[in-house]
Amino acid sequence: MDSEPYKSTGLFKKYINPNKIFQNREVLRHSYSPKELPHRMDQIDSIAEILAPALQGATPSNILIYGKTGTGKTATVKFVGTELENESSEFSPCRLVHLNCETIDTQYRVLAQIANHVSGHDLKASDKIKNTIPATGWHTDQVYSELKNVLEQAGGLQIIVLDEIDKLVKKSGDDTLYNLTRINSDLFSSRVCIIGISNDLTFKDFLDPRVLSSLSEEELVFPPYNADQLRDILHQRAEMAFFPDVVSDEVIGLCAARAAQEHGDARRALDLLRVSGELAEREGAEHVMVKHVNSAQENIETDTMSECVKTLPSQSKIVLCSMLLMAASGQKVFTSGSVINVYREVAAELDTEALSHRRVSDLINELNMLGIITTRVVSHGRHGRTTEIYFKSPTNDIRTVIMNDSRFQECGILHPLLKSHEKGD
């Protein structure tokens, strides 16, 4: 017997009201690529000057770009890259391949993504599937060989943008960069230029000197925006995002000032303005007001890190607690082996069965993926590799959550941590 067709309950009808606030909220999102970039003309000109030789068939210098989050690094590179692609149609062909290394963070993935992007550029959808390197299953040498073949067939210049390049190095070491910075010596009809983008100003410290010398032929630092510059950016986006007279200069100025206090982060300013508008929209208001900005800031500043630590499984908390103990003793960087040794002591003190070496390593990787800790792989040549672990930001909030758990308060081995917590160190 056929079941009756599903009948909607109309759950969302009460939320679909005539929109009086937004005409296009998408222009306030990080993914939006503006046609103009206020207060980044100097940086645009610098990158364009470095890449200009590509239009005459030469290989441009590799570039490392630094700057804090929300300083316009990615948007600027994409803007210049698009201009170069368009103008190169009259000269020597150039293409931009943009990879986000927060997710594409292994040598296999990087090489495969570049090859698949380049080979699929001029193919129809059905042919792209046939020419795709699988997500797993090939030896890295095979992927590298296929990448060289793809580049040779494509010809021209491929500008490889490795966004958040520090994440790739910390996860997988610098072998990927070593290979990419030397790939031109294996090519005849094609060339590669690399642009690395990082918000970690100490990123270079993680690189082998040979890789660094090849990668950082040119370096640019993007300064934070000030309040006036952020105000200009918000005005530009607000004209497209909101209906006329919905947002006042006072509201835009407040969003800009708040974001300027957060290291001149344009992303933060855009988020604050967008969430303020969404709160006004839900309220049924006709204007975005200061109270909406204040509420939006509270929403955005909800301590997601504390919530994340609170919901960790017990074993993950024990691993994290072991790192906190080491940090409390003055250590700033730990190896996975030393963390596992302390973990076993803490687990024994808590009368908890210790997990295997491999499982603890998995938990360390999970903590890294959550952003609670940061890991980097350090190569020792013939002696192999070591995973180094550190806290990128102060541990006060993490320690507070852990030590509010009664199980850890009663653990004798953690008394130094408890004393630090009580002192507020």
Curated annotation (Swiss-Prot):
Keyword Ribonucleoprotein belongs to the record: no
Name recorded for this polypeptide: ORC1-type DNA replication protein
Keywords: ATP-binding, DNA replication, Nucleotide-binding
Phylogenetic placement of the source organism: Archaea, Methanobacteriati, Methanobacteriota, Stenosarchaea group, Methanomicrobia
Species this protein is from: Methanocorpusculum labreanum (strain ATCC 43576 / DSM 4855 / Z)
HAMAP family in the cross-refs: ORC1_type_DNA_replic_protein
UniProt xrefs under InterPro entries: AAA+_ATPase (IPR003593), ATPase_AAA_core (IPR003959), Cdc6_C (IPR015163), Cdc6_lid (IPR055237), ORC1/CDC6 (IPR050311), Orc1/Cdc6_arc (IPR014277), P-loop_NTPase (IPR027417), WH-like_DNA-bd_sf (IPR036388)
Binding site for ATP: T71, G72, K73, T74, A75, Y225, R237
Record keyword Nucleotide-binding present: yes
Signal peptide positions (record): none
Gene Ontology molecular-function annotations: ATP binding; ATP hydrolysis activity
